[in-house]
Amino acid sequence: MKAFTKITAIVAPLDRSNVDTDAIIPKQFLKSIKRSGFGPNAFDEWRYLDHGEPGMDNSKRPLNPDFSLNQPRYQGAQILLTRKNFGCGSSREHAPWALDDYGFRAVIAPSFADIFFNNCYKNGLLPIVLTEEQVDRLFKEVEANEGYQLSIDLAEQTLTTPSGETFTFDITEHRKHCLLNGLDEIGLTLQHADEIHAFEEKRRQSQPWLFNG
């Protein structure tokens, strides 16, 4: 998992509430359990004018010019700004995979669906909760200023605007540790590999009958 420390990046606005996981990555693209390759189909039904299916050459599909993420000014964005209850709907870890593969490192919203929120942390994507008033202000600034960038410092738990205004956000120490060090659940377990092996050896000596056969 990629570590997250600090970024300064373009912000792309998605001015919709209750964006569900089927909108983030439609169900027909869930046939793979690899974490990569989902980016071209993120927001597929809004992003393209035709209906997408696995195996299609996305470079030849007609883009929807009215979809915000297709606008040239937001190309290369690594921060997604959106509205409340983002990531609602069915549980699918493919949703944060698709956002990550698209190029997003962080998502800012007033609220997130619980399962999606947890899945973000497991996959190196930082979900930031701000108040609706703060999100409204950011939307206005993003839309008024082409190339608008925000700076996110995870260690300090701050988000800074181009004018120098700073917002703070909450995150548990455990989640911060994992993101700062690029540790998913497997990586976190492997940090304790020596202790695990020592425990297994001690148990093998004290209860050898469990290891016969």
UniProtKB/Swiss-Prot annotation:
| Gene Ontology terms for molecular function | 3-isopropylmalate dehydratase activity
Q: Print the keywords alphabetically.
A: Amino-acid biosynthesis, Branched-chain amino acid biosynthesis, Leucine biosynthesis, Lyase
Q: Which GO terms describe its cellular component?
A: 3-isopropylmalate dehydratase complex
Q: Which SUPFAM superfamilies match?
A: LeuD/IlvD-like
EC supergroup of this enzyme: lyase
Among Gene3D superfamilies, the record links this protein to: Aconitase, domain 4
Q: What is its EC number?
A: 4.2.1.33
Recorded hits in Pfam families, A to Z, give:
Aconitase_C
InterPro entries assigned: 3-IsopropMal_deHydase_ssu, Aconitase/3IPM_dehydase_swvl, AconitaseA/IPMdHydase_ssu_swvl, IPMI_Swivel, LeuD
Pathway participation: Amino-acid biosynthesis; L-leucine biosynthesis; L-leucine from 3-methyl-2-oxobutanoate: step 2/4
What GO biological process terms does the UniProt entry carry, in alphabetical order? L-leucine biosynthetic process
The reactions it catalyses are: (2R,3S)-3-isopropylmalate = (2S)-2-isopropylmalate
- Output the superkingdom of the source species: Bacteria
Known HAMAP family for this protein? LeuD_type1
Report the protein's function. Catalyzes the isomerization between 2-isopropylmalate and 3-isopropylmalate, via the formation of 2-isopropylmaleate.
Q: Which family does it belong to?
A: Belongs to the LeuD family. LeuD type 1 subfamily.
Subunit structure, briefly? Heterodimer of LeuC and LeuD.
**Protein's recorded name:** 3-isopropylmalate dehydratase small subunit
Which species is listed as the source?
Answer: Neisseria meningitidis serogroup C (strain 053442)
Underlying gene? leuD
